[in-house]
């Protein structure tokens, strides 16, 4: 019985560890560091640079999620799987991002403005807090 419990715990632990895409996180961390350094700081910017729409726009643009034609919807929604451990949170992330995409991209306006409005919507819905970036203390 003890062996069964131990093996079960190890399987769950392994699943949790490999649920996020470590390679992608390393790439994104490097990009975020560059964007945090290069994006001009405004007086109304949040203290946490990961909640700064301009920093996130910079990072996601470098990853090809935001393009001159708009958002790569599939890639953005799938990003939930790369940065979230809990399956319920992944589902919630995808749902919230989909709602924000529909809300923002159904309105007219310049692509960059709509992309930044999308990030603003996603931040307000609490998607960052679902990711490993929101879990960091």
UniProtKB/Swiss-Prot annotation:
InterPro entries: Ant_venon_allerg_soli_2/4_sf, PBP_GOBP_sf, Sol_i_2/4. Expressed by the venom gland. The keyword Ribosomal protein does not apply. One of its GO terms (molecular function) is odorant binding. One of its GO terms (cellular component) is extracellular region. Residues 1-19 form the signal peptide. Changing residue 123 to R: In Sol g 4.02. It is found in: Secreted. Keywords: Allergen, Secreted, Signal. Changing residue 28 to V: In Sol g 4.02. Belongs to the ant venom allergen 2/4 family. Monomer. This is Venom allergen 4. It comes from Solenopsis geminata.
């Amino acid at each position: 019985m003890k062996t069964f419990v131990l093996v079960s715990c190890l399987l769950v632990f392994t699943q949790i560890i490999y649920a996020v895409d470590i390679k992608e996180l390393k790439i994104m961390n490097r990009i975020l560091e560059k964007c945090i350094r290069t994006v001009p700081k405004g007086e109304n910017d949040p203290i946490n640079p990961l909640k700064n729409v301009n920093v996130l726009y910079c990072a996601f643009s470098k990853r090809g999620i935001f393009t001159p034609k708009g958002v790569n919807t599939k890639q953005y929604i799938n990003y939930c799987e790369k940065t979230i451990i809990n399956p319920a949170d992944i589902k919630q992330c995808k749902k919230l991002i989909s709602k924000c995409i529909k809300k923002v991209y159904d309105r007219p306006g310049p692509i960059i403005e709509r992309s930044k409005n999308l990030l603003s919507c996603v931040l307000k819905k609490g998607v960052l807090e679902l990711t490993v970036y929101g879990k960091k203390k």
